[in-house]
Amino acid sequence: MKRRIALCIAVSLCAGVYAGNNPGIYKKGWIDFNKNGVKDIYEDPSAPIEARVQDLLSQMTLEEKTCQMATLYGSGRVLKDSLPTEKWKDEIWKDGIANIDEQANGLGRFGSSLSYPYVNSVENRQTIQRWFVEQTRLGIPVDFTNEGIRGLCHDRATMFPAQCGQGATWNKELISEIAQVTAEEAKALGYTNIYSPILDIAQDP
């Protein structure tokens, strides 16, 4: 849980770019994530990470902590809406969720309308991020995850051989180059956590 909260804090350092429907929470040098008008320890970028984590944990309910251990599958699967709606206030993620997986990657029922042009993919996740920062009780940013087992799981990303094929090469330098391309494309599109391939699956009972 602490690692998860620390990641949220790291993501929050970039959250200023998401200013939108609740501009009053964006202060000079910090964000009022819990909308109480006070700079709490977890909202103070200059405070030690451990202190910020402890402060945030102390303010979280059991339900909020539980949701920070859950994945919401995006792109029209579990997450049926392409963008936040009023109904989100009544959903299980109304006060946050750990991560949304494969959002706006061109797969699922929304298809390529959200994945290309690339700006559509980025803006979709930024809009969703604004909702979590501005509309949830503690404003904990969401982690946008994606698969990276044969390149980034995005219909316009570079595709590589399947993970078994990569592992069969026994070529560490080549795998490193594949990982570098995957990482650069994921970063450019705003994905913050990528699942790596299982290269030894043929030998793993």
Which ranges hold each PLM region?
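Intrinsically disordered, low-complexity sequence elements enriched in Ser/Thr/Gly/Pro
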Residues: 1-2, 63
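Sec-dependent signal peptide recognition
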Residues: 2-8
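Short, intrinsically disordered/low-complexity patches at protein termini
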Residues: 3, 15, 199-200
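A periodicity- and composition-biased signal for non-globular, repetitive helical segments
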Residues: 8-10, 71
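Hydrophobic h-region of N-terminal signal peptides that target proteins for export
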Residues: 11-19
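N-terminal beta-rich core of secreted/periplasmic extracellular enzymes
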Residues: 20-205
